[in-house]
Amino acid sequence: ARQAAAPLLPGVLLLFSILPASQQGGVPGAIPGGGVPGGGFFPGAGVGGLGAGLGAGLGAGGKPLKPGVSGLGGLGPLGLQPGAGVGGLGAGLGAFPGAAFPGAASAAALKAAAKAGAGLGGVGGIGGLGGVGGVGVPGGLGVPGVVQPGVGAAGKPPKVPGAGIPGAFPGGGVLPGAGIRFPGVGVLPGVPTGTGIKAKGPGAGAFAGIPGGYRLPFVNGLGPGGIGAGVLAGKAGYPTGTGVGAQAAAAKAAAKYGAGVLPGAGGIPGVGGVVPGVGVVPGAGVGGPAAAAAAAKAAAKAGAYGAGVLPGAGGVPGVVPGVGVVPGLVPGVGGIPGVAGVGTPAGAAAAAAKAAKYGAGVPGVGVPGVGIGGVPGVPGVPGVPGVPGVPGVPGVPGVPGVPGVPGVPGVVPGVGVGGPAAAAAAKAAAKAAAFGAGRVPGVGVPGAVPGVGVPGVGVPGVGVPGVGVPGVGVPGVGVPGVGVPGVGVPGVGVPGVGVPGLVPGAGPAAAAKAAAKAAKYGAGGLAPGVGGLAPAVGGLAPGVGGLVPGVGGLVPGVGGLAPGVGGLAPGVGAVPGVGGPAAAAKAAAKAAKYGAGVGGVPGAVPGAVPGVPGVPGVTPGVGGVPSLVPGVGVPGVGVLPGAGIPQVGVQPGAKPPKFGVPGAGVPGVGGIPGGLGVGGLGVGGLGAGGLGAGVGVPGFGVSPIFPGGVGGQLGFGGKPPKTYGGALGALGFRGGVGCAQGKYCGRKRK
């Protein structure tokens, strides 16, 4: 029976060895970590991993070792032979034999051995007899139960490099006998695996049974390679202690400072992390985000002062853009403020605004906007305005043509000094001098010097072309070229005088004002020169004859108020130029109101040359029949020329005669001297007769507006005349005698 049962025993033992309970080796708990020395629960089965008589296992944490495939012990009869088969510990445990640390002590030893690597195997135990040899690498002939010292320094088992999972038994794992379970397939070379560490053999570990890897946590599909991209699970499968996590942290820290140019050697992750770039000298390398931000900030600050010409070498940022030691003094090169430098648009605009405030500096002198900036060009020197040109020489006004010889009346009318007119001329000249016409053309402010300001002011043709003499006073004055052609009409005044230059340098506005004033009183003539208003005292009143048409200087061609140069318009007076077209138009309109005399030779019609000297009496003048035709033969030549007895004539309907017919040849009518030509009767003073064609100068004459004579006291229509004094009275304004207005004489009331 015994012999019959013997062949069946291996099968039974094999069956029991497959069971989980039997895999713990012997009777669990009999001896911590191991089975029963020598026999175990099943006699003859042995402990599996222990040599003969060594019942103490080396399970981690007091856990009994799992027997290897060959850990069935010896196959002696009924297992009575020591189970020191090839399986077991075989060559021994090196420095930490199982018997030395039974129980819990063996667990600590195993843990330390697993961490440090198993030491070199000692002298192997006695190989078991028969049985199925294990896959492990049996050691030498060890002595069971004897501690085999390892070779490691300080009693520590040394690391044995090798393929697969290094350890005491290359290719077999930490403990011998595990060859089949861990057939030399490690996850990472140099990383020991064993009990307490997840096995990484095929079909085990994180990827076991998960084809393609884990699913991504945020999508439905699977990531390439089976591991979610960028997910923490990507580290799955790496055993603890491999350094994967630490390497990732180090890489992250290194990325923070920028990758060093020199990667560094091994454990020192390049000095790169400390200093971006190469490391020792800051700023020499590429630089990291922080350096880029600082550079951008410095560039922005530099832009505020303008870009430097020299880029600079880093040094003190922002002191001077680009070069810098002195911040912002000179955009561009620095050193000399404002010399060159491109500057920035904002800076240029500010400089331009400041320069405009004080006036633009002289370009090319010094620095634009600096220094001379306050001196706005040279405009401060307004020429030599004090010298009002040569206008003071108003021609030879005293000789207004030959007007003074109009009939031998009075004090040789037309030749005299000019009386009040001289005062008026002086006054006008003084006013003109107040503005001055300057002699230096092109300098100063407009108006201060001719040639600046308004063209034609001051110098060119000052006062009169040729200054006084040619064309003024003498030739062309009075008779040809003055009185008639060009006077009052276009071309009066003098070219260049008229509008621009009424008052030298006064400009258009002042000219307009002066023209308006001149138009009010009649053009020109107020000042000596060609002005007919004043020159020739004779024409105004002197001698009874003067009041008589044809003889009086008031009208005929040369006479006082109108003749030739005379009249209210001659364009040379203190207000040069007969004023503007407006004045001429106004005068023409007013003259047209009373009719423009044809002028002609005085005396062509009876009454035109009444009594050469004007015999005072009832019917002065040659006569006509008084009272038949109003205004003809009306006495009044009397003592004061023109004073006579007004309204002697009788008109139809007992209507008093109208005095708006001056120049009809009847001297003294209403104090309005006859022979004033243009006025009143139009072409024929007495109907077809009158002054006859050509009496007086066309367009001139005193017209009823300016009754002449010293004693013209009768207003139009019997209205008392308004008193005007001074020069205005002398110029033919009614009431010019006996004015007591003093300094207000001739002034307009407000």
Curated annotation (Swiss-Prot):
Q: Where is this region: 8 X tandem repeats?
A: 83-686
* Alphabetical UniProt keywords: Disulfide bond, Extracellular matrix, Hydroxylation, Repeat, Secreted, Signal
Which compartment or compartments is the protein found in? Secreted, Extracellular space, Extracellular matrix
Residues with PTM 4-hydroxyproline: 32, 67, 102, 176, 189, 192, 211, 276, 345, 363, 368, 441, 455, 480, 576, 635, 720
Q: Which InterPro entries match?
A: Tropoelastin
Disulphide linkage map: 739-745
Return the sequence repeat spans. Answer: 83-127, 219-262, 263-318, 319-393, 394-482, 483-554, 555-619, 620-686
**PTM annotation, UniProt:** Elastin is formed through the cross-linking of its soluble precursor tropoelastin. Cross-linking is initiated through the action of lysyl oxidase on exposed lysines to form allysine. Subsequent spontaneous condensation reactions with other allysine or unmodified lysine residues result in various bi-, tri-, and tetrafunctional cross-links. The most abundant cross-links in mature elastin fibers are lysinonorleucine, allysine aldol, desmosine, and isodesmosine.
- Domain of life, per the record? Eukaryota
Q: Identify this protein by name.
A: Elastin
Q: Which organism is it from?
A: Gallus gallus
Gene symbol here is: ELN
